[in-house]
């Protein structure tokens, strides 16, 4: 069964976890990249990203580095913006026919809570079985991330 971890990362939190998870389950890594990148100024990133997420906007993403049709199983990684998935991930889900391939999701937020985001995703992802909420590295809750990622990897391995 061919597996891939598909993720978007603005600050590097999601990217670091994606690499660890892909390594742990023996999956390829596919990073989502915007055609027009976000501004480098943090306040502008927050304003634009939050607005895009709140209004369900779908910014253009670059072509993927690998052919997504070749994969049987996908693990999705996203930061949480305005209580939902990051806009580039929204673009990915709408552009590619992969909803039935996604079995696991990992999310990042300041508070480490993803319940609202996962509730929305569960309605769109019929095979979603495993999820984990991780805290951004600046958060006090980030000390639990390593254990959570390890447990997430074990759960995903049991599925695939």
Residue spans of the language-model regions?
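N-terminal beta1-alpha1-beta2 submodule of the flavodoxin-like/Rossmannoid cofactor-binding fold
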Residues: 1-76, 83-85, 90, 94, ...
């Amino acid at each position: 069964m061919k597996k891939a971890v598909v993720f978007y990362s603005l600050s590097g939190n999601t990217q670091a976890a994606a690499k660890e998870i892909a390594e742990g389950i023996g999956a390829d890594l596919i990073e989502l990249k915007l055609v027009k990148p976000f501004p480098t100024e943090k306040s502008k990133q927050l304003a634009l990203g939050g607005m895009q997420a709140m209004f369900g906007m779908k910014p253009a993403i670059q072509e993927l580095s690998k052919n997504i049709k070749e994969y049987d199983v996908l693990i999705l990684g996203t930061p949480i913006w305005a209580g939902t998935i990051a806009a580039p991930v929204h673009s990915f889900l709408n552009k590619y026919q992969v909803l039935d391939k996604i079995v696991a999701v990992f999310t990042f937020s300041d508070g480490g809570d993803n319940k609202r985001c996962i509730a929305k995703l569960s309605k769109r992802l019929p095979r979603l079985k495993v999820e984990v909420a991780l805290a951004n590295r600046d958060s006090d809750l980030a000390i639990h991330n390593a254990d959570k990622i390890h447990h997430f990897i074990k759960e995903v391995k049991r599925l695939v």
